[in-house]
Amino acid sequence: MSVHKMVKRITSSQIRARKGQQPIVSLTAYQAYTARIADPYCDILLVGDSVGMVVYGFETTLPVNLDMMILHGQAVVRGSQKALVVIDMPFGSYEESKEQAFLNASRILAQTGCGAVKLEGGVYMAETIDFLCKRGIPVMGHIGLTPQAVNRFGGFNTQGRKESDWQRIEDDAVVIENAGAFAIVLEGIVEPLAVKLTEKLSIPTIGIGASNQCDGQVLVMEDMLGYGAHVPKFVRRYGDLEQAMETAIKNYAEDVTSRAFPAEKEVYKLK
């Protein structure tokens, strides 16, 4: 009888307990194979609505729908064992009412097996977050630069450059914490404000374009691997995936056209 070692997934409660402890490692993932590779090293795998821009070529995250998020969420859950899988609620799936948010969030959890959902917004989303949390759905908040509000912001612009905006962003963070979120993403905000919020909140802050003093960091995996020409200021590239892919495909094409592939060892012979 074989014995399989069961790996326990990290929970949202465990992430919340990491406040002020060892920094939380998070990356986006959209496919089973990337989830499998990242899982041993990540505390959180975020199935972000950024999938729309990275995988589908949309200019924003707005065209992404619930079915797409569920499909990619299922793949990431299947491909991982340890990390907490958090799935973005896409634009239009939660803003109408707290009841709409619950129906769609519960569908995400039930159909994917993920551990939490993430939704964007500040004070105006507090009632919805509270409603979800009280009904057993762990929620990660997201403030600062919220990509689903790109049209309101007039682009992907850094938040908090004017100190007059600090109180509004701070109010957003505090209200989300009080509503029951287990963690909060701080995206595209000036570093002093990110540090202030991290010190003020009792839940972990996950930075992306914020500060290394946040309780954790998240990046789009393809950005840090070196895929794509555009490199945001806050991204550090740890590889050159695009160049590696191009070189491999070029070599393959050359081998096919020269009939060097397949070789003798790569074809089947009669016995």
Swiss-Prot record:
GO BP, one annotated term: pantothenate biosynthetic process
GO molecular function: 3-methyl-2-oxobutanoate hydroxymethyltransferase activity; magnesium ion binding
GO cellular component, one term: cytoplasm
Binding site for Mg(2+): D49, D88, E120
EC code: 2.1.2.11
Gene3D superfamilies per the UniProt record, alphabetical: Phosphoenolpyruvate-binding domains (3.20.20.60)
Pfam families per UniProt: Pantoate_transf
Catalytic function, reaction form: 3-methyl-2-oxobutanoate + (6R)-5,10-methylene-5,6,7,8-tetrahydrofolate + H2O = 2-dehydropantoate + (6S)-5,6,7,8-tetrahydrofolate
Active site: E187 (proton acceptor)
Subunit structure as annotated in this protein's UniProt entry: Homodecamer; pentamer of dimers.
Protein family according to the UniProt entry: Belongs to the PanB family.
Protein name: 3-methyl-2-oxobutanoate hydroxymethyltransferase
Organism (species): Bartonella tribocorum (strain CIP 105476 / IBS 506)
Gene name, Swiss-Prot/TrEMBL: panB
